[in-house]
Regions:
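Loop-to-transmembrane helix entry/capping segments in MFS-fold secondary transporters
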Residues: 55-56, 138-148, 255, 337-349
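Structural signature of the two symmetry-related core transmembrane helices
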Residues: 87-101, 286-301
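A late C-terminal transmembrane helix in Major Facilitator Superfamily
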Residues: 340-369
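Juxtamembrane intracellular "pre-TM" segments in multi-pass secondary transporters
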Residues: 2-23, 196-228, 410-411
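Symmetry-related core transmembrane helices of the 12-TM Major Facilitator Superfamily/SLC fold
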Residues: 174-191, 377-392
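Intracellular juxtamembrane helix-capping segments at the cytosolic ends
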Residues: 123-136, 324-337
C-alpha cells in the first residue's frame, strides 16, 4: 500500500534498467578527486620543507610514507573481500578529509596530513581502476584514460598555483579547501551508484593471500614492463613536483616558481585528446618511447646546467612529455590484464605510486649526502632513459586504431 503512494520519479530504477557507467562517468569522478590532489600538489613539498627544515629530512619522511602506502596498497584486495568496494572508496575519500584537517593545524601535523592523503590516494586509485576494468572494454581504455586526464586538467592546472597562493595568504586555507573537495567527491561517488563492481564468478574456495597474486604478476613479462613504465614515469613526476620547488628555493628563485611551472605543465592536459590521436596513429610504443626519451633529456640537461634558470627551463621542457607518458604509459599494463584478475592486478599496478614514492626519496636522500639536488635530477634522467630502451620491446602495433592498422596492412 505504501509503495503505491510513492511517486514514480522518486522510485529507484530496477537493476535491469540501470545504466552502465561509461568513460565520462569515471572521468567525472577522477576530475573531482583531482581538485583535492591538485590543490595540495605543490603545497606539501613547501609545507614539509618549512616544517622539517631540509631537503634530506623531507626525502626521509616521503620514503617512510611510501613504504606504508605500498603495504596498504598490496593488502587492499584482501580487505576488499571483507569490505565492499563502495565503502572502501568512501573510506579513501574520508582519508583526504582527515588529512586536510590535520594539515590545517600546521607544524609537524603536516606529516600526518601527508600520510592520510597518501592513503586516500592509493585507496581511491585502486578502487577506481578496478571499476574501470570492470566496465570499460579494452578498446576503450585509451579513450577513458584520456578523458580522465582531460576532465582533471583544470584542477591540475589551477590547483598548484592556487594552493601555493592560499598557503602564502593563510597556511590552513589550501587544506580546508581540500576537505570541502573531499566531501564533494563522496557525494558524487554515491550519486553515481557504482556499487561494488561486477561479479566475475562465485568463489569456490577460501580467499587467497593477496601477496599470492605477485606470482601471477611476475609470470607475465608484459605486466612487468607496463608496471616499470608507470614506476619511472611517476619517478619523473616526483623529481619535478617535489624537488623542483625545493631546488628553486635553495637557488634563490621565488617560492611560487614550482607551483607556477607545475600548473603550466598540467595545462597541457587539455591537449591529451590530440596526444591520444597521435598515439593511435603511430602506436603506444612510439608514444612511450618519445615520452621517455624527451623527459630523460630534460632531466639530464637540468642536472648538468650550472645556471638555475636554465636548469628549471630544462625540467619544464621535459615535463611536457610526462603528460604524453600519462596518456600512453599506462596502456601496456591495462591492455594485458586478464578479466579474472582485475581487482588484484589493479592493486599491483597502483603500487607504482608507492614504489616510486620509496625509490625517489630513498635514493634522493642518499644522493643528498654527497651531492646537491641536481644529483637527483641526474638519477631520474638515467632511469627514464632505461625505460626508453625497454619500450623498444613493445609490439609496434600496440594501441594503433583498427582503421589505421588496416591501412598499414593494405599498404
Amino acid at each position: 500500500m505504501f509503495e503505491r503512494s510513492i511517486p514514480e520519479w522518486l522510485r529507484p530504477p530496477p537493476a535491469s534498467a540501470a545504466k552502465k557507467p561509461g568513460a565520462r562517468a569515471f572521468a567525472t569522478l577522477t576530475g573531482v578527486e583531482s581538485m583535492i590532489r591538485g590543490t595540495l600538489l605543490s603545497v606539501f613539498p613547501l609545507a614539509m620543507y618549512s616544517a622539517l627544515g631540509s631537503a634530506a629530512a623531507v626525502s626521509q619522511v616521503y620514503f617512510a610514507i611510501g613504504l606504508l602506502s605500498l603495504m596498504v596498497g598490496l593488502m587492499l584486495p584482501w580487505i576488499n573481500r571483507l569490505v565492499p568496494r563502495r565503502w572502501l572508496y568512501t573510506i579513501g575519500a574520508m582519508f583526504y578529509a582527515a588529512g586536510g584537517l590535520c594539515g590545517a593545524m600546521g607544524g609537524l601535523m603536516v606529516v600526518v596530513s601527508l600520510v592520510l592523503c597518501t592513503l586516500g590516494t592509493v585507496t581511491c586509485f585502486i578502487c577506481l581502476n578496478a571499476y574501470v576494468l570492470d566496465y570499460i572494454a579494452k578498446s576503450e581504455l585509451g579513450r577513458t584514460e584520456t578523458l580522465r586526464m582531460f576532465y582533471s586538467a583544470a584542477s591540475w592546472t589551477l590547483g598548484p598555483v592556487a594552493g601555493v597562493a592560499l598557503l602564502n595568504l593563510w597556511p590552513p586555507a589550501p587544506f580546508l579547501l581540500a576537505v570541502v573537495f573531499s566531501l564533494v567527491q563522496v557525494s558524487v561517488f554515491w550519486w553515481m551508484r557504482l556499487g561494488n563492481g561486477k561479479l566475475i564468478q562465485k568463489a569456490r574456495g577460501a580467499a587467497p593471500n593477496p601477496l599470492a597474486f605477485l606470482g601471477r604478476f611476475f609470470a607475465q613479462p608484459r605486466l612487468i614492463a607496463g608496471w616499470l613504465f608507470a614506476v619511472l614515469r611517476s619517478c619523473g613526476w616526483w623529481g619535478y613536483i617535489v624537488y623542483l620547488p625545493i631546488y628553486a628555493i635553495e637557488s634563490g628563485l621565488p617560492q611560487q616558481t614550482g607551483g607556477i611551472l607545475v600548473s603550466v605543465t598540467n595545462s597541457f592536459l587539455f591537449i591529451t585528446p590530440l596526444m591520444l590521436r597521435w598515439v593511435q596513429r603511430h602506436s603506444v610504443r612510439a608514444g612511450v618511447r618519445l615520452g621517455f626519451l624527451c623527459t630523460a633529456l630534460g632531466f639530464l640537461l637540468a642536472a648538468l646546467s650550472p645556471v638555475p634558470v636554465l636548469a628549471v627551463a630544462a625540467l619544464f621542457s621535459g615535463s611536457v612529455f610526462l603528460i604524453l607518458l600519462d596518456v600512453s604509459g599506462g596502456l601496456p599494463f591495462l591492455m594485458a590484464v586478464k578479466p579474472s584478475e582485475r581487482t588484484e592486478m589493479a592493486a599491483v599496478y597502483s603500487s607504482f605510486r608507492d614504489v616510486s614514492g620509496i625509490l625517489t626519496p630513498g635514493i634522493g636522500a642518499l644522493i643528498l649526502l654527497v651531492a646537491p639536488i641536481q644529483g637527483i635530477f641526474a638519477a631520474v634522467g638515467l632511469g627514464l632513459g632505461a625505460m626508453f630502451l625497454l619500450a623498444g620491446r613493445l609490439h609496434p602495433m600496440l594501441g594503433v586504431a583498427p582503421a589505421e592498422r588496416g591501412r598499414r596492412r593494405a599498404a
